[in-house]
Amino acid sequence: MFRSRSWFGGGWNRPKNRLSLDHLKYLYSVLERNTTVSENNRGLLVESLRSIAEILIWGDQNDSSVFDFFLEKNMLSYFLHIMRQKSGGSSFVCVQLLQTLNILFENIRNETSLYYLLSNNLVNSIIVHKFDFSDEDVMGYYILFLKTLSLKLNTHTIHFFYNEHTNDFPLYTEAIKFFNHPESMVRIAVRTITLNVYKVQNPNMLQFIRDKTAAPYFSNLVWFIGKHILELDACVRNDTE
């Protein structure tokens, strides 16, 4: 009975200081003991992920050892492992994972911490992960995550997202797949992402966009705008008749 309770992160060894390296170590042990998502542990995992984001944001400004531990244990790989599961409750946990990632990247201020987070390519693996976009919450937090990442783009960080050797740019190519999404907030986010990308002065990246994506994306964008102009024209004509 006691082992079962401990397995799901019983509170006996939980550090009293919520924002501390010790608490992050405790939460890491929770992830280690709950590598498979189930209906029984999904609530625990969601709460752990939420707390991890809070500790990392605090550590970014107050204690560099927090990020050192997060990177040493490669905790982003645990996030990706959870995302790739199809077990019961995994979609529910995916929503929290995307929330956690969005909060983390939105609030991180230390450039070194940001570079460390982006350096092992796990963020790109998360971007190309096949999420269940039929879930509105997953769709919403995914596109918000991409938008948050796009706000971090500059001449230095672009190299973490655009790979010149493989000529690949997942942040951009995955985002523009949703340019014509039925939800207006998703479409607006996609426009914001593309504009944030175009602002970065990287010749090879801009050449990639022109060669690989410009024709299908901009032709579809023009068609989309034209379609709405015709619909507006029809509405005006009906009102005047």
Indicate residue ranges for each PLM-predicted region:
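Elongated alpha-helical scaffolds that mediate protein-protein interactions in large eukaryotic proteins
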Residues: 2-174, 178-241
